[in-house]
């Protein structure tokens, strides 16, 4: 594929030598939306492009992690996928829309530092962004989520976006699913609630992504099982859900066991997540309604 120099940096040429006659070269890329020009976006083959809308949160993560943890982890993961190069996804284009670093986090509002949208505002925001993405001609949208408080809203709106905008919509959520299960095999040392919030998983990822923001000397482990009494049916995982807020189940703001976290685990988990996500994207690329 041809490149050109723009301000000293190589940039993919959108048009071949016959561009003046209307000929275009196909563009294949893994990129962030905000780094593309309008013409680069317009030139993408919409039948071979998946747009990812990353959703995260700004909320308390215990005494040892920054409030931007969910957003930092998600952004780092996106950077690592992009760093693998365009050839890492031969099935077409992966375009990461600008991340939404605020979500629905009202469960954490009793702790300082949390910023949240109401359910109504968050729904409207997601719908407007998806409408804008569809207006650029894209047909396939993935809601790519790193915050458990967003999960119900994303699952709800995915069908509405299909009905209202005609988009093929998918939700990749690494909470309340088995997304991390294989990656944690052989390295997880914490128990049932060891991986949940400001936990072994998130703390390990942050030790790898942004170690200067992690205060391991302040990390505490907290198991919410006592708050659920019987812990058989009514748990934070279900099968019977409760409308709990974070302060109902933890004093520290931690749900899990961050003291088991290590940077080595974080490295392995990022590698695992990159590989798994590319596999998921490959399957999504083959699906259309």
Where are these regions (language model features)?
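Generic low-complexity, intrinsically disordered sequence content enriched
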Residues: 5, 15-18, 48
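Selective for proline/serine-rich intrinsically disordered segments
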Residues: 7-8, 52
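Short, Lys/Arg-enriched N-terminal segments with co-localized hydrophobic residues
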Residues: 15-28
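Extended, histidine- and acidic-residue-enriched regions that form the cofactor-binding/catalytic faces
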Residues: 25-140, 148-289
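Conserved SAM-binding loop
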Residues: 143
């Amino acid at each position: 594929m041809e490149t050109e120099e723009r301000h000293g940096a190589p940039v993919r040429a959108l048009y071949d030598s016959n561009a003046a006659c209307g000929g275009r070269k196909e563009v294949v890329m893994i990129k962030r939306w905000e780094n593309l020009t309008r013409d680069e976006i317009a030139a993408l083959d919409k039948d071979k492009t998946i747009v990812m809308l990353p959703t995260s949160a700004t909320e308390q993560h215990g005494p040892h992690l920054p409030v931007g943890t969910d957003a930092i982890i998600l952004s780092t993961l996106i950077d690592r996928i992009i760093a693998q190069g365009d050839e890492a996804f031969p099935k077409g284009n992966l375009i990461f829309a600008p991340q939404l670093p605020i979500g629905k986090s009202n469960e954490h509002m009793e702790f300082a530092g949390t910023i949240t949208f109401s359910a109504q505002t968050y729904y409207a925001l997601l719908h407007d962004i998806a409408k804008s993405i569809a207006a650029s001609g894209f047909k396939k949208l993935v809601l790519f989520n790193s915050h458990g408080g967003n999960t119900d809203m994303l699952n709800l709106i995915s069908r509405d976006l299909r009905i209202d905008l005609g988009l093929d919509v998918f939700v990749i959520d690494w909470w309340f699913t088995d997304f991390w299960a294989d990656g944690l095999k052989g390295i997880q040392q914490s128990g049932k609630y060891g991986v949940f919030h400001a936990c072994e998983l998130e703390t390990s990822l942050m030790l790898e992504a942004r170690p200067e923001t992690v205060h391991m000397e302040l990390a505490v482990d907290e198991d919410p099982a006592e708050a659920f009494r019987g812990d058989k049916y009514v748990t934070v995982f279900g099968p019977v859900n409760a409308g709990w807020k974070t302060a109902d189940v933890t004093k520290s703001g931690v749900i899990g066991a961050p003291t088991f976290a290590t940077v080595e685990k974080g490295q392995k988990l990022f590698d695992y997540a990159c590989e798994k996500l590319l596999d998921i994207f490959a399957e999504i690329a083959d699906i259309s309604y």
